Amino acid sequence: MGILNRWRQIGRRYFWPHLLLGIVAAGFGVPLLPGGGQEMLYQADNCPSLSRQSAFQAGFSQLARLKDVPCRTTYAVDYWHQHAIRTVIRHLSIAWAPAPLPEAVAPLRVQHQVLLTTLGLLLNREARPPVLVRRLRSTGHVAFIDNRSGIRLTQQQGIRAGPHAAV
């Protein structure tokens, strides 16, 4: 029984927070790159023809740059995504509790505040449902479907699944 409690504690402390952080990162569309993301950011700024997914590779430290990137049009925060964001905000708020820090670590605190503010804004953003596209004008042309070959096959070979001739 002791080993089951240990596995449960490991899952609660390590697995679920990292999984939820991955869900939130996937919702941002921001893959976490430990290094080498700066060159791609420079290319994304200078080359408009590169796609968003391949060119804009940023980590959590460049969240302010996400406002310039066009978002997905069908993006909406559903219930489980909101739950994941709330849990990550709770974990990060506890982990990054204010403490007396030296001046050299002050920019890191600013990044933490930007991340928490961005997650809070994402959580409170009103989701727009996808817009229905309707045909604006209808055409009077109806395609003619020629069923004569099917009728001929049903008469010659006795196929019952084809169209029936009303003779």
Swiss-Prot record:
Cellular location(s): Cytoplasm, Cytosol; Periplasm
InterPro entries according to UniProt: SecM
Pfam (any one): SecM
Residues of the signal peptide: 1-29
Tagged with keyword Cytoplasm: yes
Family classification: Belongs to the SecM family.
Protein name, per record: Secretion monitor
Organism the protein comes from: Sodalis glossinidius (strain morsitans)
